[in-house]
Design a protein with these regions (language model features):
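C-terminal regulatory/interaction regions
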Residues: 159-210
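Histidine-centered divalent metal-coordination motifs
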Residues: 11-17, 74, 132, 195
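Active-site HxH/HxHxD metal-binding segment of metal-dependent hydrolases
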Residues: 1-65
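Short, solvent-exposed loop/turn segments at secondary-structure boundaries
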Residues: 44-47, 102-105, 141-142, 184-186
Length: 210
């Protein structure tokens, strides 16, 4: 027998994350905490937080402080949570162990994702607890590698566009993600689109036609 569950925290509202929140809250009387979805694409539209947390909001108990860090990128309403006493980041889908995160526009935003990674570098992290995969050490090195990986992929996009500026998405993904198994190219194409949207916003690429 332990303490009563007081909060049920959702990092974001993708369908593999938040749908279980409501029945847990109903069974325990806990307060639902998280950001509501900003759109309906792949989102749990039934999610209704009692506390719509914002960046830097803190859950305070006698035993811990859990700080919300708004980390848009994977999806616009994504939050990471820092267990301050332990230096453990509950990373949701912002960081995965053994895989990079798929960025799905329009709610997924590559520029915001990279900036969110850089923001996390400013926090005193000791461990990263991803929603998918095991606990991760060396958080600063992990964050820096992820930023460098995305920027290296972006550089590859730019290089391929310099050779053929009118290439379509289906062809470009085979060139930019030639190190990734073909079976994953449908997912890679989504992140590639996110890279291209970022480059277009920065006036370094231009969409022509469909």
């Amino acid at each position: 027998v332990g303490d009563r569950i007081k909060w049920v925290v959702a990092t974001h509202t993708h369908l593999d994350h938040s749908p279980a929140v409501a029945p847990i809250a109903k069974a325990t009387g806990a307060q639902v905490v998280g950001m509501p979805p900003a759109d309906k694409l792949f989102q749990d539209t039934t999610f209704q937080p009692n506390w719509a947390m914002q960046h830097d909001d803190v859950i305070v108990s006698d035993d811990f402080h859990l700080r919300a860090i708004h980390t848009p990128g994977h999806v616009s309403n994504h939050l990471c949570f820092l267990l301050e006493e332990e230096g453990v980041l509950l990373a949701g889908d912002h960081i995965m162990n053994g895989s990079t995160v798929v960025i799905v526009p329009p709610s997924g935003d590559m520029k915001a994702y990279i900036e969110s990674l850089q923001l996390l570098e400013t926090y005193p992290l000791l461990k990263i607890a991803p929603a998918h995969g095991e606990l991760m050490g060396q958080p600063l090195e992990t964050l820096r590698w992820l930023v460098e990986h995305r920027l290296a992929r972006e550089a590859k996009v730019i290089d391929k566009l310099a050779v053929n500026s009118s290439v379509n998405l289906a062809t470009l993904v085979t060139q930019v993600y030639d190190d990734v198994d073909v079976s994953l190219h449908d997912y890679a194409q989504l992140s590639l689109l996110a890279h291209l949207i970022k480059l277009e916003k920065e006036l370094r690429a231009k969409s022509v036609g469909e």
